[in-house]
Amino acid sequence: MASQGPLELQPSNQSQLAPPNATSCSGAPDAWDLLHRLLPTFIIAIFTLGLLGNSFVLSVFLLARRRLSVAEIYLANLAASDLVFVLGLPFWAENVRNQFDWPFGAALCRIVNGVIKANLFISIFLVVAISQDRYSVLVHPMASRRGRRRRQAQATCALIWLAGGLLSTPTFVLRSVRAVPELNVSACILLLPHEAWHWLRMVELNLLGFLLPLAAILFFNCHILASLRRRGERVPSRCGGPRDSKSTALILTLVASFLVCWAPYHFFAFLECLWQVHAIGGCFWEEFTDLGLQLSNFSAFVNSCLNPVIYVFVGRLFRTKVWELCQQCSPRSLAPVSSSRRKEMLWGFWRN
C-alpha cells in the first residue's frame, strides 16, 4: 500500500513501512511526480491564506468590545483550531517536496501529525456543537438561557479540545521516523503494534471522527431548515429574530463547506482501512486509494482557509463587528455618533 496523506500519513506496503512507489503496483508514476511538484506550492498557499484569514477572524472576535455570543464563542474556537492546524502545513509541504523523506526529526514528526490529527476531531466536534446551538435557539427557543448557554459553550469548547487531544494521543505516541531502504528515505510513519489496531483506527477515524458527528450534524440542520420553513424565517424577537436568522445562514454555509471539503478524505480513509484489513485488494484499489487520499487531504486543507472567506461574504453580523472594530480603533471613534447616523453608515458600507 502506498502512502496516506498528511492527515494520517502511513507510507506503507504490506508491512506498513514503505512510501509511494515502494510496492509492486506502480501504475501511476507520472501522477505521483506531478503531485510531488505541485502539491507543496498548493499547501503553502493554503498555509498563507489560512494564517492570515484565521488570524484576522480571531482578532475581530477577541478585540471587539462586546461580549461574545454563544455562536461567536464556537466560531472563535473553530478559527483557533484552523489556525493551529495551518501552522503545521509548511512542514508537510517540505515533506511532500522531499518525496516523504522527513527532514525535521522524530519530535516534530509526532507533534505536526498529532496536531493535524487533533484538528480533524476538534473541527468536526465544533461543527456539531455549532449545529446543536442553532437547533436549540430555533427549534427549542424557550429552553435556552443566554447567560447559562454562554457558560455551557465555554465548557463545551474546553471538552472538545480535550477530546481532540486524547483521540490524537496514538498519533503522538506511535508516529516515528523510520528508514525505508527501498527509496532511500527516512519517512515519518505511523507504526501500529498489531493488526487489530487497524480496526480500532477505522472506528476512531471513520466512526468517531465522521459518521457519528455527521449523523448529529444532519439531524440538527434538517430540523433547523424545517423550523425556518415553518416560520418563514420570521422568528419572534424573544426567540431569536433577524440576528439569529443571519447567524443561522452563516452557520449552515459553514456546515455545508465543512462537509464538502472533508467528506472525500473520510471516503478514501475508509477505503484505506478496508485495504489494511484485506477487505479489498489489487493494484487498481491500491493506486485509486493512494492518489485519492493525497488529493482529498488537500481538499480538506482548503476548509481551513475557506471559513474566513465565508465569515466575510456570508456573515453580515461578522462584517458589522469588523466595522465596529474599525470605528473602535479609529481616532474619530472618540466623537459621539448618533444611532441613526451609525445605522446609515453601516448600511452604506455594506451596500457598496
Swiss-Prot record:
GO terms for cellular component: external side of plasma membrane. Induction: In response to tissue injury. It is a multi-pass membrane protein. It comes from Oryctolagus cuniculus. PANTHER family: B2 BRADYKININ RECEPTOR (PTHR10489:SF957), CELL ADHESION MOLECULE (PTHR10489). The chain crosses the membrane at residues 40-63, 73-97, 111-132, 155-177, 199-225, 247-271, 291-314. Disulfide bonds join C109-C188. Keywords: Cell membrane, Disulfide bond, G-protein coupled receptor, Glycoprotein, Lipoprotein, Membrane, Palmitate, Receptor, Transducer, Transmembrane, Transmembrane helix. Its main location: membrane. One of its GO terms (molecular function) is C-C chemokine binding. PROSITE patterns: G_PROTEIN_RECEP_F1_2. GO terms for biological process: calcium-mediated signaling; cell chemotaxis; immune response; inflammatory response; positive regulation of cytosolic calcium ion concentration; response to mechanical stimulus. It is found in: Cell membrane. Residues 1-24 are annotated as: Disordered. Residues 64-72, 133-154, 226-246, 315-352 are cytoplasmic. It comes from the Eukaryota. The gene is BDKRB1. Belongs to the G-protein coupled receptor 1 family. Bradykinin receptor subfamily. BDKRB1 sub-subfamily. Glycans are attached at N13, N21, N184. A lipid is attached at C329 (S-palmitoyl cysteine). Residues 1-39, 98-110, 178-198, 272-290 are extracellular. Pfam families: 7tm_1 (PF00001). This is B1 bradykinin receptor. This is a receptor for bradykinin. Could be a factor in chronic pain and inflammation.
